[in-house]
Amino acid sequence: MTTDSAEHTHDPILPDVAMHLVPPMKPVIGRVTESRNCMKGKSASFVRHVSIDVSGTPLEGAFRSGQSFGVIPPGVNHNDKPHKVRLYSIASPTRGEDGEGKVLATTCKRLIDEYWPQTPKDDETRHDLFTGVCSNYLCDLKVGDEVKVTGPVGKRFVLPADPARHDYLFLATGTGIAPFRGMISDLLEGHDGPVESDIHLVMGVPYTTDLLYDDQLRALADKHPNFHYHTVVSREIQSDGTKGGYIHHYLDRQIHLHETLLSGDRTLMYLCGLAGMQLGVFQFLARAGLGDPYLKVKEELQDVAPSDWDTKSMKRNVRPTHRCMLEVY
């Protein structure tokens, strides 16, 4: 939990959360209650919304939106060792998919790729198909199937204890939308009623068909005037003949929409998705003069133009503040 000074610095006071109630060495059994495609249209990717009943286990009623849980796939790896736990973001509100905290869900993308050399010792001619063990196991499960689960995990990438004290900018790429689905539901559809906070979600994808939970999010935006849903499609040609760009390009182009939000004392920023998003967003904040509430830049980088930052220097010299929550992979 943050210190009492948070009330004076506009930092969020985070709630106490349960963690590691179910360790990987002693998983519990959940049961799949739903598995459905959650993409807007036909795509080169395969992403499923998978719901798991954890009633009667320590996970029941113990997780919060923004946390993660673990899945242990059956079988052994190439060393004949049991597969290790894989973590997945919880895509459900704190009250669960069922409203009682008994069913949690995640947003799982199948990993399907070709082998490619990553070290000088790897076989350069190898190009056979590689399929992710846990993602495909999880996506293959059918309603009624049992699955070993652990968790919950995570204490910082959560909503503040008093959500109404803050406004929100959520930035997501791909399956990074998962925790925001739950958080936005908590903010707008929680038991205490919708908050009046200003809430913006920016979702970045390669193609329109890659949008996740699009119908649900648009319905929420239509119903709640304080919730604004923005999509950024990077590889499709826009009406003006240009490509859509990435999230940081969108923020730069639409700064007139977000400058007031970002400069406000109440605003919290959450980023979730591919790690490549982090550099562009941090550069945008610094370049626009909006970085102070969200970034701590070490002296080594303070006199360097943000456009000259690279991933290595950023990781070494830029840290998010308590008002910037980061979950990238």
Q: What positions do the PLM features span?
A:
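Classical protein tyrosine phosphatase
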Residues: 60-82, 173, 178-200
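Conserved beta-strand elements of the Class I
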Residues: 148, 167-171
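Ferredoxin-reductase
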Residues: 33-141
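Short, charged beta-turn/beta-strand-edge "cap" motif at the junction between a beta-strand
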Residues: 75-78, 150-156
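Active-site-proximal polar cores
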Residues: 144
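Reductase modules of NAD(P)H-dependent flavoproteins
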Residues: 2-10, 17-28, 43-45, 195-329
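Short helix-loop-beta connector
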Residues: 160-165, 263-265
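Generic structural signal for buried aliphatic residues
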Residues: 69, 147-149
